[in-house]
Amino acid sequence: MADKADQSSYLIKFISTAPVAATIWLIITAGILIEFNRFFPDLLFHPLP
């Protein structure tokens, strides 16, 4: 079993990398949606008949 120092370093590493990874993922997703909407307008919204 890992000692306390290893566990706290893993926690600090997770806390510092999780927001960075989430931010990068959201920026990429937003970019894909923006470019899709630029090349194919009106395909992201389908009004009800």
Curated annotation (Swiss-Prot):
Give the matching SUPFAM superfamilies. Subunit IX of photosystem I reaction centre, PsaJ (SSF81544)
Keywords for this protein: Membrane, Photosynthesis, Photosystem I, Thylakoid, Transmembrane, Transmembrane helix
Q: Does the record bear Iron in its keywords?
A: no
Q: Which residues form a coiled coil?
A: none
Q: How does it sit in the membrane?
A: Single-pass membrane protein
Can you say where in the cell this protein is located?
A: Cellular thylakoid membrane
Q: Which residue ranges traverse the bilayer?
A: 14-34
Task: Identify the domain of life.
Answer: Bacteria
Main localization is membrane
Q: Name one GO cellular component term.
A: photosystem I
InterPro entries, from UniProt? PSI_PsaJ (IPR002615), PSI_PsaJ_sf (IPR036062)
Tell me one Pfam family matched here. Answer: PSI_PsaJ
What Gene Ontology biological process does one annotation of this record name?
photosynthesis
The answer to whether the entry has keyword Transmembrane is yes
Q: What does this protein do?
A: May help in the organization of the PsaE and PsaF subunits.
Q: Which HAMAP family match?
A: PSI_PsaJ
Family, according to the entry, reads as follows: Belongs to the PsaJ family.
Which NCBIfam families has this protein been placed in?
PRK02733.1 (NF002743)
Write down what this protein is called.
Photosystem I reaction center subunit IX
* Gene name in the database record: psaJ
